[in-house]
Amino acid sequence: MATSTTTSLKEFLSVFPQLVADLRALCLEEYQLPACVWDRFESTLNHNTLGGKCNRGLSVIDSVRLLRDGLELSPAEYFDAAVLGWLVELLQATMLVLDDIMDGSPTRRGKPSWYRVPGVGMAAVNDATMLESAIYMLLKKYFAGRAIYLPVVDLFHETALQIELGQAFDMLIANEGTPDLTTFVPATYSQIVTYKTAFYSFYLPVALALHAVDAATPTNLAAARAILVPMGEYFQVQDDYLDCFADPTVLGKVGTDIIEGKCSWLVVQALQRASTDQAQLLAENYGSASGESSVKALYSELDLESVYRTFEEQRVAELRTLITGLDESQGLRKSVFEELLGKIYQRRK
């Protein structure tokens, strides 16, 4: 067992086979389903849950350790935290499968998107729902009858709905690639990313950790949310920047925000700075494959890379101020938030 406050990916990955075995037993032994059904489920699990950085899942374990002031977790405590972490990764996998279909993304994590794998296609929609349902079966197996069970079930249900509502807002405002750019304003962007990204990527792992150490008081949850939502927005701004400016071979996927007409941070910033002619260029080209190069050229003309770097430093300074003022009297720890911020600051993929 690692003694540092940062768990290793190898250690975290070592728990996954047990969860796969649990689901295998459910399908083949309890449900008596044919092997072909389990084979499909297992392929779905392995392709979509593995292969990423697992930052969300690892954050659950790291947060539990930090909330316990860096004390080494017992094997049972580590396993519980790792299970909760893997359930966050299953929720992430669910949403990525569906997001890739809606965005038409050809790759994910350097591999073909699941729906692009031969023999999968639109059946990936059902595969995604299997991934989400697995969350609740595993929660039942490991936490039923314990005090955290119902609050954590509720937390996963609410978080899933938040993501889905954020995704719906994102798609509606993109209007199938023909967006009304007058609606692309900072307040709208902030609301979309709060629900689409911030809650599940940042608030969920820490809230789960607070439940795991019996410190999920209303005060602590509210304080965590006040820091983690703007941190999650910063993370999504990074994603939007990387979607346009990062090397796809490094990022592991091909950016599609411009082609899809998404309400990206970059286009919101461009619209705030554009002249009348530049705004017209955006209106004519944003949301089409043929106009992507023109939009990227305009982003360079407006020096949005510098705008992004300025935003990053300002947001990080604001977050550090919030962390400094955090009340630790009910068991919350500043180190939880410092650790998360350190992981994402100036990331390049």
UniProtKB/Swiss-Prot annotation:
In terms of InterPro entries, this protein maps to: FPS1-like (IPR039702), Isoprenoid_synthase_dom_sf (IPR008949), Polyprenyl_synt (IPR000092), Polyprenyl_synt_CS (IPR033749)
- Cite the entry's keywords alphabetically: Magnesium, Metal-binding, Transferase
According to its UniProt entry, the protein's GO biological process terms are: farnesyl diphosphate biosynthetic process; viridicatumtoxin biosynthetic process
Q: Which reaction does it catalyse?
A: isopentenyl diphosphate + dimethylallyl diphosphate = (2E)-geranyl diphosphate + diphosphate; isopentenyl diphosphate + (2E)-geranyl diphosphate = (2E,6E)-farnesyl diphosphate + diphosphate
Cofactor remark: Binds 2 Mg(2+) ions per subunit.
- Associated pathway: Secondary metabolite biosynthesis; terpenoid biosynthesis
Instruction: Please give the GO cellular component terms listed in this UniProt entry.
Output: cytoplasm
Q: Where does Mg(2+) 1 bind?
A: 99, 103
Provide the binding site for isopentenyl diphosphate: 53, 56, 92, 109
Q: Which residues bind dimethylallyl diphosphate?
A: 108, 196-197, 236, 253, 262
Q: Report which superkingdom the organism of origin falls in.
A: Eukaryota
**Residues engaged in binding Mg(2+) 2:** 99, 103
What this protein is reported to do is described as: Farnesyl pyrophosphate synthase; part of the gene cluster that mediates the biosynthesis of viridicatumtoxin, a tetracycline-like fungal meroterpenoid with a unique, fused spirobicyclic ring system. The first step of the pathway is the production of the malonamoyl-CoA starter unit for the polyketide synthase vrtA. The aldolase vrtJ may be involved in the synthesis of the malonamate substrate for malonamoyl-CoA synthetase vrtB.
Family of the protein in this entry: Belongs to the FPP/GGPP synthase family.
Tell me which PANTHER family the record gives.
FARNESYL PYROPHOSPHATE SYNTHASE (PTHR11525:SF0), FARNESYL-PYROPHOSPHATE SYNTHETASE (PTHR11525)
Q: What is this protein called?
A: Farnesyl pyrophosphate synthase vrtD
Q: Which organism is it from?
A: Penicillium aethiopicum
Give the organism's phylogenetic lineage.
Eukaryota, Fungi, Dikarya, Ascomycota, Pezizomycotina
Q: Which gene is this protein's source? A: vrtD
